[in-house]
Design a protein with these regions (language model features):
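Mid-chain, structured segments of secreted extracytoplasmic proteins
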Residues: 56-108
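Bacterial Sec-dependent N-terminal signal peptides
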Residues: 1-21
Length: 164
């Protein structure tokens, strides 16, 4: 009985920590391969980042994390800005397992609070893409396209997201 209990605890721990799979970052303001390299170095230096795969033509970066850490998306965006560039898009790939969402669209994932824009859902299931909304996760011209009412009041420790 002890072995079964320990096995179940291990399985639960593994599934809970593996929810955030990766981040896809699209940068803006790049003009050459050296620009891509500057962002690569800045993002790779973040303590919780495991690997960074670069697509120079699309100016995108697939970022994977150390399994025992919680990613901080604000630190990723700050690294890009500190390198002298802008974040055009930051999309988080998440594997949900019946994730509860409250009536205000709030849910917590790996200790990180999110607010879902648009129609509130009761739960999230399966693999989903969450686009981070707001400054510094998108370009100002794209942010202006979102009605202010949809942005609403969001706590400073909460990420505003939309399903992609």
């Amino acid at each position: 009985m002890k072995k079964i209990f320990l096995f179940l605890i291990c399985c639960w721990t593994i599934s809970a920590s593996a929810q955030v799979q990766k981040v896809n970052l699209q940068a803006s303001g790049l003009t050459c391969a050296m620009c891509s390299k500057a962002i690569y170095k800045a993002v790779s230096a973040i303590s919780f980042v495991d690997t960074v795969l670069v697509n120079i033509e699309a100016s995108t970066y697939d970022i994977r994390f150390d399994k025992e850490t919680t990613p901080r998306f604000d630190q990723i965006a700050k690294a890009v800005v500190d390198a002298g560039f802008s974040v055009a898009n930051l999309t988080v790939m998440v594997n949900f397992d019946k994730q509860a969402v409250d009536k205000n669209g709030l849910f917590t994932l790996d200790g990180i609070q999110f607010k879902l824009m648009g129609t509130p859902l009761a739960s999230l299931q399966g693999s989903k893409k969450l686009q981070l909304v707001g400054k510094p996760y998108m370009l100002p011209k794209d942010l202006k396209k979102i009605p202010a009412a949809q942005l609403g009041n969001v706590a400073s420790n909460t990420y505003l997201v939309s399903l992609k």
